[in-house]
Amino acid sequence: KLFKTILVVVICFGIIMLLGASAFGGDDSPTIKKRAIVGTFVDKSDHSWYRGNNPGEGMADMLITALVKSGKFKVYERAALDEILAEKNLSVSDLANDGVEAGKKLEIGDVLVKGTITEFGYKEKKIGGSIASGLLKKAAVKQYTARVGVDLRIISVGTSEVLWADNLAETKTSTSIGISTDKFSFGDQNTFDEHIVGQATRNVIDNIVKKIEQITKDMKWTGILIVADEFYFIDAGSEIGIKPGMEFDVKRERKKVTHPKTGKILKIIYDEVGVVKATEVEEGVTTVEAVSGTGFQDADYVVFKEK
């Protein structure tokens, strides 16, 4: 009996430890935030009912906020992005151009998100009618149906490849429009979320964030190596989650394979140069040391080694 009791206790303890590891440990491998660049959404919807500013700017700002709140992305505010692009004589459209040097683009971000608003509005209809019954009348009920749709493209900044492209749309139906359309504005989050179109828009933004997370999950973060005498640095730091001890493969571009007719870059061949490890991490820069390999050069690529 004593043996059986001990055996049961051991088994129970083992189960508890496994459950605890699953619940609290999870996937605790270190990760790096992807740098997402959000372009202004082009508006091609018929929104004559809406008297506010361009909904494209409003939806782009909503997406920036949602990506930051997810904790998985580093996202530039629009003014900061414009300043960085100006310093490098680039535009947002250049980030999707494979004719622009990859290293120059990768100093700015990993993925570019571009959208075109195809639907942004609501319809109203009456359900039933007024039926007389003595002195009482049953009033018709109004039903509101909002629909918001976006043609979305997620583009790799490094390769200019379109990683995903499709339409994301949401429909919201209610017997209440929420608030007066005259008060509906992207600038007031409370009233925005009360309006039926605002609710549909919020759902679209949430789905866009999920899609970006899904598409970028297996992307390996790539940065640039900076060589200063005998010292080595990476052009990013604590703002994207780099920590001391993280290791990076160092690669050097050997050849671009281009289409003979269109000139489109089909593939880039890299040489493996070595491995570096983060020793000191600051905002915007990480000091690294060589783990293996020699002959590191300025502007070599560094690729995060997933554990």
Residue ranges: model-predicted function:
Residues 91-162, 243, 254-263, 267-269, ...:
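Surface-exposed short loop/turn segments
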Residues 32, 111, 148, 228, ...:
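Exposed loop/turn and edge beta-strand positions of beta-sandwich/beta-sheet ligand-binding modules
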